[in-house]
Amino acid sequence: GTLTTYGYLFDFTNADVNSTQNFGLRFAGGTDVSEDARVLYTLEYAIQKDYADNPQSFEAAYWLAEVGLAVYGLTFKVGMETLESDDGRSFQTPLATLHAMNGWADQFLVTPDDGLQDLYVSAGASAKGVKWLAVYHDYSSDINSLSYGSELGLLAVYPINKHYTVGAKFASYAADGRGVDTDKAWLWGEVKF
C-alpha cells in the first residue's frame, strides 16, 4: 500500500468561517490473494481545526475505512466515511467536489451541522467495453442519531474509441429527515483531442 500525509492551511479573507487547518494520513492499496482476486483497502484520518481569523473555535475529524474485492473483472467495495461535528460545527470541504464522494444527487455538497456518516456499498464491472457501476449510500448524522436518507446511483460509460466517450448516470435520493426525495439523470458525450 501507499501511505500519504497531507496538510492544508486555508485562510479565506472574505469567508473567515471557512478558514481551517487540516492534517491527515491516508493508506491505500491492494493485495493479490490469488491469480484472479485482489483485496483492496483504504484507511484515512484527518483533523480539522479553526485557523487564521475564523471566528469559531472547533476541532472535527474525518474518517474513512473501505475494503473491497476485485475478482474476474468485478469490483465490490464497502466503506464508511464520517465527517464529524464538534457541537454543531462540522468538518467541511469547501474546495472539494462532494458530488463524486457523497452521492450524485448532490444532497451533501455542504456537510450538515450534525456531521455526516456515509455507509456505502458498490459494485462495478466492465463488459463489452462498457464500464458499469452501482453505488448505494445510507446517510446519517455523526451526532444526535439522525437518519438523513439513502441513495442509489447507477453509471454506464462507453468509450467509442480513443477520442469519443458517451455515458449515462442516474441518482435517486430517498429523504428521511433531511432534504426531499430527489431523482437526477445525466447523458453526456466527451471528445478528446
Give the ranges of each region predicted by the language model.
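Outer-membrane beta-barrel channel domains
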Residues: D183-K192
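Signature for the C-terminal beta-barrel architecture of outer-membrane proteins
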Residues: G1-G88, L119-V121, S126, W132, ...
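Extracytoplasmic loops and strand-loop junctions of Gram-negative outer membrane beta-barrel proteins
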Residues: N102-V110, D114, A171
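Acidic/polar loop-and-plug regions of large Gram-negative outer-membrane beta-barrel proteins
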Residues: F91-W104
